[in-house]
């Protein structure tokens, strides 16, 4: 349907797409859900992955542009044939926020929701103190902490180069892709943790 017709979407998908476009603008395009063709090309979810050629990258990079993802009430349109939206970077956070909202509506006052590296806090501990959450060190084995956060009622989301990757010719290639270069982002940071009111 990309490049051909508008697709009917649910209100939830519409909200996620609108948020995605907002984050694309705020990040100057570094957060971009239209990286679907790039994600498929690298195939990092598979242990072998795929190290793409320059020609392959040149084929998919022009398909990445959130400005070409159009959203109107109940419908979405990808402007160019071959475009694919990949909501992996935002969907889990959005779902986590919805679960938290549902629990709060049901009267839950104290809870820790752990969805992997998306952690949401409802209120504080029953005795009135802050929750303490450990942040995994991405350069160490599972369970070795880089930092500890104390908070109440917040969302703590971490993404790092240690989550999904493959090794090619002795070098690790992780899943956080730069939509401008087509390669895994090379920022010098092994992981980033955001503390905010929401997860999405």
Name each model-derived stretch:
Residues 1-200:
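Mature catalytic core of soluble alpha/beta enzymes
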């Amino acid at each position: 349907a990309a490049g051909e017709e508008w697709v009917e979407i649910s209100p939830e998908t519409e909200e996620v797409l609108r948020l995605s476009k907002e984050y694309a603008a705020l990040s100057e395009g570094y957060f971009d859900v239209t990286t679907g063709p790039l994600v498929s090309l690298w195939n990092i979810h598979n242990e072998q992955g795929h190290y793409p050629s320059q020609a392959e990258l040149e084929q998919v990079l022009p398909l990445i542009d959130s400005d070409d993802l159009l959203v109107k009430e109940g419908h979405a349109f990808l402007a160019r044939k071959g475009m694919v939206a990949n909501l992996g970077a935002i969907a889990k956070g959005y779902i986590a926020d919805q679960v938290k909202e549902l629990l709060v509506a049901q009267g839950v006052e104290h809870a820790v929701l752990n969805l992997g590296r998306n952690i949401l806090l409802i209120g504080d501990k029953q005795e009135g103190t802050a929750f303490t959450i450990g942040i995994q060190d991405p350069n160490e084995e599972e369970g070795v902490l880089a930092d500890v956060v104390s908070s109440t009622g917040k969302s703590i989301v971490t993404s790092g180069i240690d989550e999904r990757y493959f090794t090619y010719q002795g070098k690790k290639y992780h899943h956080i892709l730069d939509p401008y270069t087509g390669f895994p982002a090379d920022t010098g940071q092994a992981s980033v943790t955001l503390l905010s009111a929401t997860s999405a």
